[in-house]
C-alpha cells in the first residue's frame, strides 16, 4: 500500500538529524527499523521543534515515485504513512515516508562523489567519469527527472554507488531522495499560489550546472531517454488519496508544475 491513511503507532522509532533545512528554522529527521530481517528507513518532512512538521517533502517523495513509475524510470519506491511519532519526548501526528534498503546482500554503498575521488582520471569531470563507468543512460534519465520536478538537491551524495567486492560488481543505486523538489519551498497556500512553476531556479547539482533546464542540453539529441509519455489523465494517478494530506491549492500547483514542465520537455525534444 503506497499511501496508508489509517494512523500507525511508530512512537518506538528513534529519530536523528541528517540535514538542516536550508532557509528555514527546521531540520530533516530520519530513523530506521529492522523487523523480520527487513531494514526500513523512515524520513520526516521539514521539522521544527516548536511547530512540528512545517514541510511536505514526504508527500513529494510519493508523488515523484508515482511520476517515475508512469514514465518507466527505475527508482526507489516510497510509502507515505500517517503515524504518531515521538521526537525529543514530544508526540507528533505526521505523514512520513518509508522505504526499504536498496542494497542487495553483500553490497556496500558509497556516495558517487566519494567514489569518483577514488577512481577518477586526472581532470575528469563527473559526467565523463559516469560515462566511462557505463552509467550515461542513468545520468540522462536523472537529468530529465530533475528538470521535471525542479530537484533542488542532487548533490554528490544523493547518487549512490553500490559495490559487491566478492562478485566484483559496481552499480548505481536506483534514483531516490526527491523530497526537496516541486513546491518544497512553499510553506503555505499563499506562497504556492504565487510560485512560478517554470522558473529556472538554481539547484545543487553534482553533474552539470545549477540549471536543470540547461542540463537537458548535456544529453545528446540521439540519446534522449525513451520515456512513457505523461498525459493529462495522469493527474489523478499522481494525486490520488492526497485530499486531507495536502491542500487543494498545493495539489493544483504541483500538477501545473509537472504538466507544464513535461510539455516544455517534449517541445525541447521535438526542436532538436
Where are these regions (language model features)?
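Active-site-proximal structural scaffolding
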Residues: 57, 61, 138, 152-155, ...
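A short, terminal or domain-edge coil/loop segment
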Residues: 8-16, 128-144, 184-190, 203-215
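A broad, structural surface signal
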Residues: 62, 66-70, 137, 141-145, ...
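Conserved ATP-binding subdomain of kinase catalytic cores across diverse folds
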Residues: 1-110
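Conserved kinase catalytic-core segment
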Residues: 122-187
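Short alpha-helical "patches" and their helix-cap loops
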Residues: 78-86, 157-164, 271-272
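ATP-dependent phospho-/nucleotidyl transfer catalytic cores
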Residues: 89-93, 98-143, 244, 264
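C-terminal catalytic region of ATP-dependent kinase domains
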Residues: 166-272
Amino acid at each position: 500500500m503506497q499511501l496508508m491513511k489509517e494512523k500507525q503507532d511508530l512512537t518506538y522509532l528513534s529519530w536523528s538529524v541528517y540535514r538542516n533545512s536550508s532557509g528555514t528554522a527546521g531540520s530533516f529527521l530520519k530513523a530506521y527499523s529492522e523487523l523480520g530481517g527487513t531494514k526500513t528507513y523512515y524520513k520526516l518532512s521539514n521539522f521544527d521543534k516548536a511547530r512540528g512538521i512545517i514541510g511536505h517533502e514526504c508527500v513529494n517523495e510519493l508523488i515523484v515515485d508515482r511520476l517515475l513509475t508512469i514514465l518507466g524510470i527505475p527508482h526507489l519506491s516510497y510509502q507515505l504513512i500517517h503515524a504518531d511519532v515521538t521526537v525529543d519526548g514530544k508526540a507528533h501526528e505526521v505523514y512520513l515516508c518509508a522505504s526499504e534498503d536498496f542494497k542487495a546482500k553483500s553490497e556496500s554503498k558509497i556516495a558517487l562523489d566519494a567514489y569518483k575521488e577514488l577512481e577518477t582520471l586526472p581532470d575528469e569531470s563527473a559526467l565523463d567519469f559516469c560515462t566511462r563507468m557505463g552509467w550515461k543512460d542513468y545520468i540522462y534519465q536523472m537529468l530529465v527527472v530533475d528538470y521535471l520536478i525542479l530537484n533542488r538537491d542532487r548533490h554528490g551524495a544523493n547518487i549512490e554507488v553500490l559495490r559487491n567486492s566478492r562478485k566484483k560488481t559496481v552499480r548505481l543505486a536506483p534514483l531516490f531522495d526527491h523530497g526537496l523538489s516541486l513546491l518544497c519551498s512553499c510553506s503555505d497556500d499563499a506562497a504556492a499560489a504565487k510560485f512560478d512553476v517554470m522558473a529556472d531556479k538554481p539547484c545543487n547539482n553534482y553533474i552539470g550546472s545549477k540549471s536543470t533546464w540547461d542540463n537537458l542540453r548535456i544529453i545528446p539529441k540521439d540519446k534522449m531517454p525513451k520515456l512513457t509519455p505523461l498525459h493529462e489523465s495522469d493527474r489523478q494517478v499522481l494525486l490520488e488519496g492526497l485530499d486531507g494530506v495536502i491542500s487543494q491549492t498545493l495539489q493544483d500547483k504541483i500538477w501545473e508544475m509537472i504538466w507544464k514542465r513535461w510539455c516544455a520537455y517534449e517541445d525541447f525534444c521535438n526542436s532538436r
